[in-house]
Amino acid sequence: MQGPLYIGFDLSTQQLKALVVNSDLKVVYVSKFDFDADSRGFPIKKGVITNEAEHEVYAPVALWLQALDGVLEGLKKQGLDFARVKGISGAGQQHGSVYWGQDAERLLKELDSGKSLEDQLSGAFSHPYSPNWQDSSTQKECDEFDAFLGGADKLANATGSKAHHRFTGPQILRFQRKYPEVYKKTSRISLVSSFLASLFLGHIAPLDTSDVCGMNLWNIKQGAYDEKLLQLCAGPSGVEDLKRKLGAVPEDGGINLGQIDRYYIERYGFSSDCTIIPATGDNPATILALPLRPSDAMVSLGTSTTFLMSTPNYMPDPATHFFNHPTTAGLYMFMLCYKNGGLAREHIRDAINDKLGMAGDKDPWANFDKITLETAPMGQKKDSDPMKMGLFFPRPEIVPNLRAGQWRFDYNPADGSLHETNGGWNKPADEARAIVESQFLSLRLRSRGLTASPGQGMPAQPRRVYLVGGGSKNKAIAKVAGEILGGSDGVYKLEIGDNACALGAAYKAVWALERKDGQTFEDLIGQRWREEDFIEKIADGYQKGVFEKYGAALEGFEKMELQVLKQEGETR
């Protein structure tokens, strides 16, 4: 038998994936179960069931049981020696809740290795479905959550986020009102991450220190459930009952929850000393896959844009999210989510290609990139010209809270004057650089105060900027990212593909079981992580003069957002 192995699971909306790594963090096996393609007997599409009438989106929990046996069978077929697996952790789609019935603990304890999980545990749930993050049925409950402590900013201050449809607190509130009898018969409530850990333990696992922050119920500064918010959420059964349902939350993200249940020992050949480590949320797991060091920034440039940062500063705002860091006490995960990302850039790319008569060109981004690189920062040919800036939202945006639309402005940093205009813009050419600048200025604006100076008299900025997703292949976008966000070490493209969450979970298991006393995740994984396998430097970061020019543009950008919000009569 060779060295120890560790498994990271990723239970996402459309699949369950398992990634097996060794102590050197090398991936040795991968097994996937695609819900639509591989499951039997569930009326799902893209992993979920949709009830349009009530804006509900949910998944059958039994589907996930079928998937877990399926993924483990896949690893068995590939020849994994399960006896070498020393630790297991996981990542779960955030915010989703699982409602266990009164027989849950007994059924988990009495699993028969000759039968499937689905056959034995389908009766373990008081409610057969788990709400998905795409669910938007809780507007009424969100309004109540936002108002309960005296406003969205107060809720964000306490729990790290204002109320969101997908967050577990508003979902539980709606659930206990819609199904009061089922709620009474619910013995425990798990998040998707702790549900996964529970299956391996053979009893219900506690919630994870980071994932619990996606509920609108956990007071981050106090490190405890917020009594007032529990009161709002609990309904007639009362606060103590809800506390029992949720259970205690251990502070250590690497705590040993216990050994694997004998079901897996007998059915697959796991060793009896295989340890279960808390599973975390998919976004927290992503920052572990890097590993993201304090003040590093990661920008996911997909259809939407997600910005993740590890920071020691807790500066909540209704437009952003803060979570406890999944492994490192004293750090937080900062997150921003935008609806308009790649789609908005593609609109302008297509308009440029149409105007140039090159719609069928083999590299659709070639013209967009060329124009972006040839255009001066903020469209200023000379310093006395006004700065061109705009907002480009083909779909309604959440940061800031605005309808779909386009707004263009000229800003004069010398006197602070701002004018909405369509004149002086050469459309769509001027919009290529303007949209990339607009997206990155918004990130810089909202992450102000979270970074420190890297030294040598440099202004506060990230150490590194990592780009992932489709947009990371684009050299022009990378160059502008470095000019606006800085990055004393540069801008890097990260190639983890779609394995980031499972990889982060596997690394978490390695750290939890191989750390020395007091050794942080960043230290242990940082020593073993071979960055040349995953990252490539694609652009310079901080450039003196350019970074400062964008600092001046930031004031105009903030004014522009506020003016458009005022015009549209919407508040953030």
Curated annotation (Swiss-Prot):
Q: Which InterPro entries match?
A: ATPase_NBD, D-XK_euk, FGGY_C, FGGY_N
EC class, as a word, reads: transferase
Presence of the UniProt keyword Protease in the record: no
| UniProt-recorded Gene Ontology molecular function terms | ATP binding; D-xylulokinase activity
Q: Which UniProt keywords apply?
A: ATP-binding, Carbohydrate metabolism, Cytoplasm, Kinase, Nucleotide-binding, Transferase, Xylose metabolism
Q: Where in the cell is it found?
A: Cytoplasm
Tell me its EC number(s), please: 2.7.1.17
Q: Which SUPFAM superfamilies match?
A: Actin-like ATPase domain
Spans through the membrane: none
Keyword Disulfide bond attached = no
**What upregulates this protein?**
By D-xylose, L-arabinose or L-arabitol.
Protein family membership = Belongs to the FGGY kinase family.
Q: What is this protein called?
A: Probable D-xylulose kinase A
Q: Which organism is it from?
A: Aspergillus oryzae (strain ATCC 42149 / RIB 40) (Yellow koji mold)
Give the lineage: Eukaryota, Fungi, Dikarya, Ascomycota, Pezizomycotina
